[in-house]
């Protein structure tokens, strides 16, 4: 019984932090009028264009919107595995 109460009232915050991050993303999406579907489409287009020049880890690619005050930034974390040779370059 004590273990249950300890878990119930613990200050672990794991699920609290996840819920807070999800709410933040929803609010940012609402403020910018960008739907999650549009963000996924943008992510797919970024993969397509960047893949022309670099070998990237598509599974680890992350794209999000970050809000700071009145500004919103598109933040992309794109792990690069290597560069591709582009026609016409030495």
Swiss-Prot record:
The keyword Cell cycle applies. One of its GO terms (biological process) is regulation of division septum assembly. InterPro entries: MinE, MinE_sf. Belongs to the MinE family. Prevents the cell division inhibition by proteins MinC and MinD at internal division sites while permitting inhibition at polar sites. This ensures cell division at the proper site by restricting the formation of a division septum at the midpoint of the long axis of the cell. HAMAP family: MinE (MF_00262). This is Cell division topological specificity factor. It comes from Pelotomaculum thermopropionicum (strain DSM 13744 / JCM 10971 / SI).
């Amino acid at each position: 019984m004590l273990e249950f109460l300890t878990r119930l009232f613990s200050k672990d915050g794991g699920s609290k932090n996840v819920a807070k991050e999800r709410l933040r993303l929803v609010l940012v999406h609402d403020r910018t009028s960008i739907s999650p579907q549009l963000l996924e489409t943008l992510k797919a287009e970024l993969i397509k264009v960047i893949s022309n020049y670099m070998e990237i880890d598509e599974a680890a690619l992350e794209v999000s919107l970050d809000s700071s005050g009145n500004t919103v930034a598109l933040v992309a974390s794109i792990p690069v595995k290597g560069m591709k040779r582009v026609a016409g370059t030495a």
